[in-house]
Amino acid sequence: MAHAERTFIAVKPDGVQRGLVGEIIKRFEQKGFRLVALKFLQASEELLKQHYIDLKDRPFFPGLVKYMGSGPVVAMVWEGLNVVKTGRVMLGETNPADSKPGTIRGDFCIQVGRNIIHGSDSVKSAEKEISLWFKPEELVEYKSCAFDWIYE
């Protein structure tokens, strides 16, 4: 396989509360991506402010941090060929109204403020987000038995 990359995916509090964690994991697994890390946690305000630092000057920033801290989240790292780009396609548009049926947001969301999932928007962002949410030793290295059936 060509260079595999990693992406950071987080099921937001609304996705956890609505019982969509399993469905989201299922979609990434069925696509052929490999889960290398997973945490179920109540994110601290400090962690969330660091995660969304690029949005700190936007008017919705305080509300976003409050919403993301309102309940538990599921933080994950997925690996595979073009996983950042493909993962974003699987998520759908940030605004669910613009998301196509078949995408996670297109199938399960109505409003942008409750769009159930976050996914890294670039390889650089993924690296930053992964290092923010996970220690290096929390990323598990293994070869999936399905690997040879997914990649040439």
UniProtKB/Swiss-Prot annotation:
Its cofactor is Mg(2+). GO terms for molecular function: ATP binding; DNA binding; G-quadruplex DNA binding; metal ion binding; nucleoside diphosphate kinase activity; protein histidine kinase activity. It comes from the Eukaryota. ATP binds at residues 12, 60, 88, 94, 105, 115. One of its GO terms (biological process) is nucleoside triphosphate biosynthetic process. It catalyses: a 2'-deoxyribonucleoside 5'-diphosphate + ATP = a 2'-deoxyribonucleoside 5'-triphosphate + ADP; a ribonucleoside 5'-diphosphate + ATP = a ribonucleoside 5'-triphosphate + ADP; ATP + protein L-histidine = ADP + protein N-phospho-L-histidine. GO terms for cellular component: cell periphery; cytoplasm; lamellipodium; nucleus; ruffle. It is an enzyme of class 2 (transferase). Its EC number is 2.7.4.6, 2.7.13.3. SUPFAM superfamilies: Nucleoside diphosphate kinase, NDK (SSF54919). It is found in: Cytoplasm; Cell projection, Lamellipodium; Cell projection, Ruffle; Nucleus. The active site is at residue 118. Major role in the synthesis of nucleoside triphosphates other than ATP. The ATP gamma phosphate is transferred to the NDP beta phosphate via a ping-pong mechanism, using a phosphorylated active-site intermediate. Negatively regulates Rho activity by interacting with AKAP13/LBC. Acts as a transcriptional activator of the MYC gene; binds DNA non-specifically. Binds to both single-stranded guanine- and cytosine-rich strands within the nuclease hypersensitive element (NHE) III(1) region of the MYC gene promoter. Does not bind to duplex NHE III(1). Hexamer of two different chains: A and B (A6, A5B, A4B2, A3B3, A2B4, AB5, B6). Interacts with CAPN8. Interacts with AKAP13. Interacts with ITGB1BP1 (via C-terminal domain region). Interacts with BCL2L10. Belongs to the NDK family. PANTHER family: NUCLEOSIDE DIPHOSPHATE KINASE (PTHR11349). This is Nucleoside diphosphate kinase B.
